[in-house]
């Protein structure tokens, strides 16, 4: 709509930031090399500068905290205190619903409900304007909002409107905000206090991870998870695209009680991995399953082989780049193309390159470049004829599990899904591979497959927040974005590096990933490591602007000063507050 009104810059600024979930896991003391509990976490956000996070150590007579904080949020969001380590990852459940409302053409503020007509609430919001004054002919903005029983109206004509229900609106009494929940976590010393601090949290749901100095681990889901009227629906957690507001179908009737949310203390496995489906199978979760499955497999292998991993192994796992669909893609290509004479020598050379590939998406791999181009070509050729280019772009950018569609296509070989110009699955694979090779060839500007590198196509640009709201100024102020950085991985690897699927110059550009990594071993206060993408400072001329980038790229995390000895050793400056 903003594009239609010729405000493309504003549309870009208000568009949802990329990034799907985060990685997080805890390991109990019985499984670790140090005999202390581990917490490993990497939070996924858009790659920007300055970074969304800053590292801090806070100490007062009754409390010592260290870890990653966010501007405007008091305390530490992911980190530790003297007794426990804590972190959180987003829980991707449906927390927003849209309702179609019927309004009376004779009485503009009356809308239809299951029991008859009701009056919409009219609210006037005053938006402060800086330097507003009658002297300069400016004043605060007044904006009228209509609100139905479902929530505020987003768009309306004479007889119909769309209302938004969201968990952040109209919270019940005796609930606390996310900032208050984090404050309580910061002061928790054990599992009971950890759970108690989350019990009344209301807002977007998260999975909160726990580890303590006694070797215990746990997790607790918390937040507002709406339960819906099940009339005509498969289950109470499932959302519809657009609910008829006058019927009652899909109305929010309650929130899932805290006692019924998934949690565990010292799980029998000896570890827990966030963002993976647990026992509540009826709750739809918008997940990329491959990353969590890979972490689970690695931890399960350690346990099966009676190996005791240390923090270095956890750091390597955070940077894991194994492509989950590599065996399937290689087998599919070999079966379809290896038995045909319909491809040229150039494509055979590319096929040989991907056949010899080890399945790891390193930045220097030619096989990785071909793999990425192929799976993107497959999903686009399936979706675009049915959805159109624009809607296919929206789907691929908003759905983190699009590669699961590719997996299903390659496994089932269902001819009904093929584009109209294809008659057989084999022919579809051959032409898709040909297009994938062509795309890599154009991106790499080379005719030699052995010279192609995934990192040459897959680069991060740390976009300045100043330019995100005004992309039209990029040609003039693009220097604020800094240099691009080649990376491996993709959206499916543990080292999650999500890239654009849009055709054109932005294709393969890496847009989001782990903007912060944390590793904590609670057996030793000096075994606390954390790394940001760039650095602590937003000043382009500061030595601290990008001094962590090399450590972040090479998976060599930096120590965080928590013990007095390490604090004295690595600190350059200290800010001391007194009561005088």
Label every model-predicted segment:
Residues 1-580:
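C-terminal/peripheral segments of proteins
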């Amino acid at each position: 709509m903003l594009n239609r009104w010729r405000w493309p810059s504003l549309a870009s600024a208000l568009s949802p930031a990329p990034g799907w979930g985060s990685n997080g896991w805890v390991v109990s003391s019985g499984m670790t090399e140090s005999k202390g509990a581990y917490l490993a976490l990497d939070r996924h956000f858009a790659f920007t500068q300055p970074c969304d996070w800053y590292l801090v150590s806070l100490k007062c007579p009754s409390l010592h905290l260290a870890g990653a904080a966010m501007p405007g949020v008091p305390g530490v969001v992911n980190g530790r205190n003297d007794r426990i380590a804590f972190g959180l990852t987003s829980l991707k459940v449906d927390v927003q619903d849209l309702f179609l409302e019927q309004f009376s053409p004779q009485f503009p503020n009356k809308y239809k409900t299951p029991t008859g007509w009701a009056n919409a609430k009219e609210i006037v919001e005053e938006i402060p304007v800086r330097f507003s004054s009658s002297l300069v002919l400016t004043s605060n903005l007044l904006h009228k909002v209509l609100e139905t029983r479902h929530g505020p109206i987003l768009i309306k004509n004479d007889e119909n409107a769309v209302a938004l229900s969201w968990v952040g609106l109209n919270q019940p009494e005796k609930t606390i905000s996310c900032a208050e929940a984090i404050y309580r976590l910061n002061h928790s010393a054990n599992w009971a206090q950890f759970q108690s601090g989350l019990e009344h949290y209301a807002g977007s749901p998260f999975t909160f991870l726990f580890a303590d100095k006694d070797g215990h681990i746990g997790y607790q889901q918390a937040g507002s998870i709406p339960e819906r009227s099940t009339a005509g629906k498969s289950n109470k957690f499932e959302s519809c695209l657009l609910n008829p507001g006058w019927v009652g179908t899909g109305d929010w009737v309650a929130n899932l009680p805290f006692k019924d949310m998934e949690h565990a203390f010292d799980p029998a496995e000896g570890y827990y991995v966030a963002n993976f489906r647990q026992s509540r199978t009826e709750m739809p979760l918008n997940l990329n399953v491959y990353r969590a499955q890979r972490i689970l497999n690695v931890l399960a292998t350690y346990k099966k082989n009676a190996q005791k991993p240390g923090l270095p192994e956890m750091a390597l796992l955070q940077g894991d780049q194994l492509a989950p669909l590599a065996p399937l893609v290689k087998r599919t290509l070999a079966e379809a193309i290896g038995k045909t004479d319909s491809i040229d020598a150039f494509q055979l050379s590319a096929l040989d390159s991907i056949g010899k590939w080890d399945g790891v998406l390193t930045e220097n791999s030619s096989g990785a470049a071909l793999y990425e181009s192929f799976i993107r070509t497959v999903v686009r050729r399936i979706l675009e004829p049915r959805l159109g280019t624009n809607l296919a772009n929206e789907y691929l950018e908003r759905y983190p599990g699009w590669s699961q569609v590719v997996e299903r296509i390659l496994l089932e070989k269902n001819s009904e899904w093929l584009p109209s110009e294809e008659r057989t699955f084999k022919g579809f694979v051959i032409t898709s591979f040909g297009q994938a090779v062509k795309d890599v060839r154009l991106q790499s500007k080379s005719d030699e497959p052995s010279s192609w590198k995934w990192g040459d196509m897959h680069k991060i640009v740390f976009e300045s927040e100043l330019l995100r709201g005004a992309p039209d100024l990029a040609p003039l102020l693009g220097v604020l974005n800094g240099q691009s950085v080649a990376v491996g991985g993709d959206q499916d690897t543990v080292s999650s590096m999500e890239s654009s699927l849009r055709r054109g110059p932005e294709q393969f550009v890496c847009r989001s990933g782990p903007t912060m990594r944390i590793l904590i071993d609670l057996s030793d206060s000096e075994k606390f490591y954390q790394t940001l993408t760039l650095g602590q400072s937003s000043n382009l001329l500061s030595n601290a602007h990008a001094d962590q980038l090399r450590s972040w790229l090479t998976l060599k995390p930096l120590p965080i000063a928590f013990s007095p000895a390490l604090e004295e050793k690595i600190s350059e400056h200290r800010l001391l507050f007194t009561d005088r």
